[in-house]
Regions:
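Conserved HGGG/HGGXW glycine-rich cap/lid loop of the alpha/beta-hydrolase fold
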Residues: 9-68
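Conserved alpha/beta-hydrolase "nucleophile elbow" surrounding the catalytic nucleophile
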Residues: 30, 97, 101-103
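Hydrophobic, aromatic-rich cap/lid helix
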Residues: 165-190
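Short beta-strand/loop motif that positions the catalytic acidic residue
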Residues: 197, 203-205
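Catalytic active-site module of serine/aspartate enzymes centered on a nucleophile-bearing elbow/loop
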Residues: 230-265
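Conserved alpha/beta-hydrolase "acid-adjacent" motif
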Residues: 210-215
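Active-site loop/oxyanion-hole signature of alpha/beta-hydrolase fold enzymes
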Residues: 41, 48-51, 58-98
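Flexible "cap/lid" loop of the alpha/beta hydrolase fold
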Residues: 107-151
């Protein structure tokens, strides 16, 4: 798939048209240590969108996949990644689309919506919730960077950091680029700013997603926010799950109503 130079850096992307006329376009933004293939293609999202007549655009965010691999934290941050996403839409001649981010990609997606609200038809945020607004624990940024740069993964102290490191190793990612990405300085997203976004917003997370928190807490910030909690899912198992796909497509179809009941299996 092609690479294009955007904002002076090389960005890899896929642009997949449906078999017939496109009914709509979606921009996909993957999570930390993932990439467009692992986050969206392998998990079945490409064919799922294609079957529904949706043009699918997905990029490897800076430091990930086949895109630029800077080892300087100054080259990362939410604002840079959002600018890359908007520049890709410009390059492809897309004026307006749906935007779907997962985990780290939700932060990029929200920044895209804040920077260019007129270009986002629907905003979908997965693997995120009320913990977005929690202060970062002291040393957490350094801990993630250290986990990515550690010579011996056995020295990593927490299970969450071990999971991200294992995931990065499985994808063959550049760990020094990921360390720089995790150390980037991005100001917190503010409730008041997010509350100005008037497009429909979906916030969805697994019931066992300890990284996200309650999706309802975040959804309440948006004037047209809706939340869904996925039973039986954690942060990593939610993205390929059929329940997440059903939720996203019901949302796009305007049919999303109630959350899954607590006893859903």
């Amino acid at each position: 798939m092609p690479n294009v130079t955007l904002n002076g850096v090389s960005i890899a992307f896929d642009d997949i048209p449906p078999a017939g006329p496109a009914q709509r376009t979606v921009l996909l933004l993957h999570g930390f240590a993932s990439n467009r293939n692992e986050g969206w293609k392998r998990t079945g999202w490409y064919p799922a969108f294609e079957r529904r007549g949706i043009r699918t655009i997905a990029l490897d965010q800076r430091g990930h996949g086949e895109s630029v691999k800077s080892h300087d934290p100054a080259d990362y941050g939410r604002e840079h990644m959002a600018a890359d996403a908007l520049a890709l839409l410009d390059h492809l001649g897309v004026q307006r689309c749906d935007v779907f981010g997962y985990s780290m990609g939700t932060r990029t997606a929200m920044q895209v919506a804040l920077d260019a609200p007129d270009r986002v038809s629907n905003l979908m945020l997965g693997g995120i919730g009320g913990k977005l607004f929690d202060p970062r624990p002291a040393g957490s940024v350094e801990a993630m960077a250290d986990a990515m740069s550690a010579e011996d993964p056995a020295t990593i102290k927490t299970e969450m950091l071990k999971s991200f490191r294992q995931f990065a190793d499985e994808q063959g990612e550049d760990r020094m680029a990921l360390a720089a990405c995790s150390a980037a300085d991005s100001p917190p997203l503010e409730r008041d700013a997010l509350g100005t976004l008037t497009m429909p917003v979906l916030v969805v997370a697994g019931r066992h997603d300890d990284l996200a928190g309650d999706p309802e807490e975040l959804a309440r910030v948006f004037p047209r926010g809706k939340s869904v909690t996925l039973p039986g899912c954690d942060h990593f198992s939610a993205i390929p799950h059929g329940l997440l796909k059903a939720t996203v497509f019901d949302f796009l179809d305007g049919m999303l109503d109630d959350d899954f009941p607590d006893n859903y299996r």
